[in-house]
Amino acid sequence: MKLLSKFFISSALAIFAIAVVANDDWLRSMPEFELTDHLGEIHTMESYSDYDLAVFYVQGVGCPIARIALPNYREVRDEYSGKNIAFTMFNSNIQDNLPRIAKEADEFGIDFPIIKDEGQQLAKALGVERTAEVFVVDTETLDVLYRGPINDQLGYETQRNNASEWYLKDALNTILAGGIVNMDDVPDSKGCLVAIF
């Protein structure tokens, strides 16, 4: 009986360890970087040191989902404007240079800095797969505390009139309260594929 109990305990611990490793692999750390945005400003993680958290949105020129999700991202920024959180974007697409990004920002009224991820260093370090995904970063530890969609309004070839789940807001509320986001409750992000080279 004791051997059986030990077996079940060992199995449970092994499963837990695998889950922790998988979660750690999904929630990676933001690397140190020095990159330029579409306005010519240079960004490093030190640029965000006065903030408690920094939220990064994966932008892509011409991506309809990334464009449609923009008002939702803006809504979250405005709602949390007094919470000492920075909101920005980065673009990892090889084909999107700074002039193209600047043109997109002008045409669609994007009022966030859009960092050009030269060499795809952010995308490779974070495991970026699609646009319109957001990453919440602890500016002190550089740990990614959340990654996923803003909400459930957008899907492939579908769009709800209103979102019923605001995953980013829920994550920020949990983090600000000192909790840990349960990534098992977060669906995969919908967006345009980011080709990694």
Which role fits each region the language model picked out?
Residues S10-A17:
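Bacterial N-terminal signal peptides
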